[in-house]
Amino acid sequence: MKRILIIMAVLMMLCPDIYALTKKAEDSPAVQVLTSNKNARKLEGGMLKLARPALKKTPMAVVMDDIDMMVMYSISQKADEEEKQFAQQAINVLESYNKVSEIDDPDYRMSIYIDNPVGENFSEIILYTSRPDPSIMVFIGDFTIASLKKVGEISDQKRMERRRAKR
């Protein structure tokens, strides 16, 4: 009985620390991947967080809300030469801001471009997997419209070309 009481006392003493650690983890940068089968997958560097409902129809969505976060990408092995060059232009702009890291994971074979910057501190990144299955990464970061404008213009042209090709 004495041993049980000692163990309980030690656990009670540790509880505040455990709570503090949990709270700290909750405050860390949030990263979540929602796959087509609705399974959440944790990426390195953050706690899981629910993506916004507007992305329900997409096979995958990644949300990151840390101001100093990295954009993760991988250019598809299946992408044609034009798509690879296009993705590389977007990556070059992001790399100039030290905001990009490559994902070394076969599940993330996709090209990347920036679409629809909508505010000073918000932009959407569209990740295209092998057609016809697009995936969307949304991030909130400290990019400005000016830093994304060039790639945004390229993405607008590309989107129009894709629409014309579908007709």
Name every feature range the model reports, one short phrase each.
Residues 15-22:
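Sec/Tat signal peptide C-region and signal peptidase I cleavage site
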